C-alpha cells in the first residue's frame, strides 16, 4: 500500500477535530478511497470522513487495509507539518504504518497499527428546514466569539439570512446574508431555530480550513449538520445533537 497526498495540512485539520471527539480512530482504506466514522463518548456528535482515491496524488491500494491510531499521538506527529508538504502513507505489513512528511526535510515515522473497533452507527434519515452555504472563515469567527460568552449557540434563519448568537453576561450575534457576501446560498422550507452546545462546535472548528464554504443544515430540535467539501471530491460531515431545554 502506498498513498501520497500533496497537502498534509488537510489531514492535520481533520486529526485536530478527531482529537476532541475520540481517543482512537480507524481509517478504513479501500481500493476506491478512505473512510472514517467516529462518535464521541457521550453520543452527542458524529464525524464522517470520505476521501475518494481521485483526490490523491498517488493511490495504490490493492486491497482493504484498516489503520487504527491514537488521535493524540497522530496530532503531535502532524503538529510540525508545513504548507505544501506531502504526506506519504505506506504499509508492507498489517502491524506498522510508515508515515513520511515530505518537504524541504523528510521526516519518517513508523506508527503502530492499533486495533480500533468501528462505531455502531444507527441509520438516520434527517430532514432539514434550512440548508445554507456559509463563508467558512466567517462561520469560524462567529463560533469562536460565541464560545467566549456563552455555552449555547442559538441559530435561526429565514428566507434571506442566517443568524447565530450566544447570550451570557454579554451577547454576541452574527448575521450571514447574501448582501454581505457571507451567505452564498440558502434552501428554505420554513423559518426555524434551534440550540446547540457551542463547545462541541468550537472543538471541530479546524475543519473550516478544508473548504471556503461550509454547508449548514438544521431544523427545530433536530441535529445540526455541517458539511465541508474539499478539492478533489473529499467530504467531511459533522452531526451535532440539539441542546434541548
From Swiss-Prot:
Recorded hits in InterPro entries, A to Z, give: DNA_clamp_sf, Pr_cel_nuc_antig, Pr_cel_nuc_antig_C, Pr_cel_nuc_antig_CS, Pr_cel_nuc_antig_N
Q: Name one GO biological process term.
A: leading strand elongation
Pfam families, alphabetically?
PCNA_C (PF02747), PCNA_N (PF00705)
Q: Which UniProt keywords apply?
A: DNA replication, DNA-binding
**Disulfide bonding pattern of the chain:** none
Q: Where are the transmembrane segments?
A: none
One function term, GO molecular function aspect: DNA polymerase processivity factor activity
Q: According to its UniProt record, which protein family does this protein belong to?
A: Belongs to the PCNA family.
Q: How does it assemble?
A: Homotrimer. The subunits circularize to form a toroid; DNA passes through its center. Replication factor C (RFC) is required to load the toroid on the DNA.
Q: What does this protein do?
A: Sliding clamp subunit that acts as a moving platform for DNA processing. Responsible for tethering the catalytic subunit of DNA polymerase and other proteins to DNA during high-speed replication.
Q: Record's NCBIfam families?
A: pcna, PRK01115.1-3
Name it: DNA polymerase sliding clamp 1
What broad taxonomic lineage does this protein's source fall under?
A: Archaea, Thermoproteota, Thermoprotei, Sulfolobales, Sulfolobaceae
Amino acid at each position: 500500500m502506498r498513498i501520497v497526498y500533496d497537502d498534509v495540512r488537510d489531514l492535520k485539520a481533520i486529526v485536530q477535530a478527531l482529537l476532541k471527539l475520540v481517543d482512537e480512530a480507524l481509517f478504513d482504506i479501500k481500493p476506491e478511497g478512505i473512510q472514517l466514522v467516529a462518535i464521541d463518548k457521550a453520543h452527542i456528535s458524529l464525524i464522517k470522513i470520505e476521501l475518494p482515491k481521485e483526490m490523491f496524488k498517488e493511490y495504490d491500494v490493492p486491497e482493504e487495509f484498516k489503520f487504527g491510531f491514537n488521535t493524540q499521538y497522530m496530532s503531535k506527529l502532524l503538529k510540525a507539518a508545513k504548507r505544501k508538504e506531502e504526506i506519504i502513507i505506506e504499509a508492507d505489513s498489517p502491524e506498522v504504518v510508515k508515515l513520511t512528511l515530505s518537504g524541504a526535510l523528510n521526516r519518517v515515522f513508523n506508527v503502530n497499527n492499533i486495533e480500533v473497533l468501528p462505531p455502531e452507527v444507527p441509520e438516520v434519515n434527517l430532514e432539514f428546514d434550512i440548508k445554507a452555504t456559509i463563508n467558512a472563515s466567517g462561520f469560524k469567527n462567529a463560533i469562536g466569539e460565541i464560545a467566549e460568552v456563552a455555552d449555547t449557540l442559538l441559530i435561526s434563519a429565514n428566507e434571506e439570512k442566517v443568524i447565530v448568537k450566544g447570550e451570557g453576561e454579554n451577547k454576541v450575534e452574527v448575521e450571514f446574508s447574501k448582501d454581505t457576501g457571507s451567505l452564498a446560498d440558502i434552501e428554505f422550507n420554513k423559518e426555524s431555530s434551534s440550540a446547540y452546545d457551542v463547545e462541541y462546535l468550537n472543538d471541530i472548528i479546524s475543519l473550516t480550513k478544508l473548504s471556503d464554504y461550509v454547508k449548514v443544515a438544521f431544523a427545530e430540535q433536530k441535529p445540526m449538520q455541517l458539511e465541508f467539501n474539499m478539492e478533489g471530491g473529499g467530504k467531511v460531515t459533522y452531526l451535532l445533537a440539539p441542546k434541548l431545554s
